[in-house]
């Protein structure tokens, strides 16, 4: 059953709408629509940046929030009062989430392309800086050279050593180094 509760972080889905709208624009060339959606998408990005981002710049989500609630990525031992099995699906587990972080980077990239297409210059530098910082963070902190894989990070900076499909967002975002 889908659910929505105001101010509940599990009620916020993944940040993929800028990507979707850019694909729509590339297929149909509807610049009026692009102009209408740009600022709401930018506002959503800023909202997530303010409320779903850790101090190191990485992003978090939850099982329901990321849409992949069946992944074994939440460590119940890190969650206070975790006797409730549902917390595994609903809690962010104090982690930096690889998919949420890469989706934020992709959103920056697509918002930049939209802004350039629309002749908007105000936000481009800040978005480009965030994009560069996120990509650097992901490749420096979330990549395991030993395993050749991207991982979520625990609060202490160590890898959550569970391989999940969330790492494949690095391929979708086209940020994985060629080697």
Place the predicted regions along the sequence by residue.
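Catalytic cores of carbohydrate-active enzymes
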Residues: 49-66, 103-179
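TPR repeat positional signature
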Residues: 14, 18-21, 101, 108
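Generic beta-strand or strand-like secondary-structure segments
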Residues: 16-23, 40, 47
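Short, conserved alpha-helical segments within structured domains
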Residues: 13, 37, 127-130
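Active-site acid/base region of carbohydrate-active enzymes
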Residues: 28-98, 133, 143-146
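Hydrophobic/aromatic side-chain positions at a characteristic register within alpha-helices
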Residues: 26-29, 116
């Amino acid at each position: 059953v889908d659910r929505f509760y105001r101010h509940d972080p599990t009620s916020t889905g993944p940040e993929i709408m800028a990507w979707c709208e850019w694909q729509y624009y590339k297929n149909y060339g509807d610049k009026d629509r692009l102009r209408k959606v740009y600022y709401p998408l930018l506002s959503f990005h800023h909202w997530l940046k303010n409320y779903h981002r850790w101090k190191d710049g990485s992003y978090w989500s939850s099982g329901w929030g990321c849409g992949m609630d069946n992944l074994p990525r939440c460590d119940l031992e890190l969650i206070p009062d975790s006797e409730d099995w549902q917390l595994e699906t609903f809690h962010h587990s104090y982690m930096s989430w690889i998919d949420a972080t890469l989706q934020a980077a992709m959103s920056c990239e697509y918002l930049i392309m939209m802004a350039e297409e629309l002749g908007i210059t105000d936000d481009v530098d800040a978005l480009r800086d965030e994009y560069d910082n996120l990509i650097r963070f992901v490749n420096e902190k979330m990549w395991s050279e030993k395993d050749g894989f991207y991982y979520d990070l625990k609060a202490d900076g160590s890898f959550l050593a569970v391989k999940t499909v969330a790492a494949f967002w690095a391929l979708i975002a086209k940020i994985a180094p060629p080697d």
